[in-house]
Amino acid sequence: MSILFHAYPLARPALFAMDAETAHEVTLAQLQRAYDCGLTRKLLHAQPEAPATLMGLSLRNPVGLAAGLDKNGAHIDALGNLGFGFVEVGTVTPRAQPGNPKPRMFRLPRANALINRLGFNNQGLDAFIANVQRSQWRSQGGILGLNIGKNADTPIERAAEDYLISLAGVYPHADYVTVNISSPNTKNLRALQGGDELSALLGQLQERRLALADQHQRHVPLAVKIAPDLSDDQIDAIAEILPRHGIDGVIATNTTLARDAVQGLPHAEEAGGVSGAPVHELSLRVIERLRSRLGDAVAIIGVGGILSGRQASEKMAAGAQAVQLYTGLIYRGPALVGECVRALAQGSR
């Protein structure tokens, strides 16, 4: 355990000298090698006991991996064994697509932030499912979330078709499914967060889920991932719609388009969504508002800007039942997982 944890701070300067997306790929490849050699196998069992329940699912601990880090589900076991209680991979679209032109990911180290405009780059649903089927994570008791989106060339008016295709494909292989309607990097996608559009989409997804549950004889929870840039009225409308359509969870939040916290920094004006530290307070506002409107009707997963155990605890105090990490891992490395688990275990005593 100590070898891996000490290795990342030593490797970080070299990784940060690379293009951000290249460094991301190198890190995943090295992590996979470490897992294949057995160097990460003990990390999963080194965390303190912090059992939690989320959307009816039993978690080892309430600290998860956010979608986006492993878009194709190729590294589920290696990532899960860093000590996560649950892992979410994707976003996957029905057909493979390259995403936006490179460069499309930028670090802002002074703000502990990233800007990305990746655009749902992925190998498509068939390759994604094949990767998921090869994973041992679920058979070892890990919880797996599969995150679905729409192809860039699918008109927004036909977005539901893409989500329905992907839901049917991933349903047998998921512990829960996340409907991503909040990436700022797919044209018009965030329009699906609007009241009428959201209600229409979720109505179709719930109908399909009921049929899939009957076909596979199991209920798979559905979550919706939303943006941090919503007004109070928009949050209230979403909070009214989710339980009406039987949605089990809401992930708050995705990246922000706001630039206030990074103004004047190199790359600050690059197009795309900001993740990392600047999102923490924005997501707290959304979580608090959702919890006040939802009560206990829908589970909330808090994500955005968690770079310490204290910030994970703040997400829970705001009303989340679980948290997810992504950008914090890039700045802090795998030690962040255990720090967050310990903080939440201590807070639950």
Swiss-Prot record:
This is Dihydroorotate dehydrogenase (quinone). The keyword Membrane applies. Belongs to the dihydroorotate dehydrogenase family. Type 2 subfamily. It comes from Bordetella parapertussis (strain 12822 / ATCC BAA-587 / NCTC 13253). Binds 1 FMN per subunit. Pathway: Pyrimidine metabolism; UMP biosynthesis via de novo pathway; orotate from (S)-dihydroorotate (quinone route): step 1/1. The active site is at S183. It is found in: Cell membrane. CDD domains: DHOD_2_like. It catalyses: (S)-dihydroorotate + a quinone = orotate + a quinol. PANTHER family: DIHYDROOROTATE DEHYDROGENASE (QUINONE), MITOCHONDRIAL, DIHYDROOROTATE DEHYDROGENASE (QUINONE), MITOCHONDRIAL-RELATED. Catalyzes the conversion of dihydroorotate to orotate with quinone as electron acceptor. Pfam families: DHO_dh (PF01180). The keyword Membrane applies. Its EC number is 1.3.5.2. GO terms for cellular component: cytoplasm; plasma membrane.
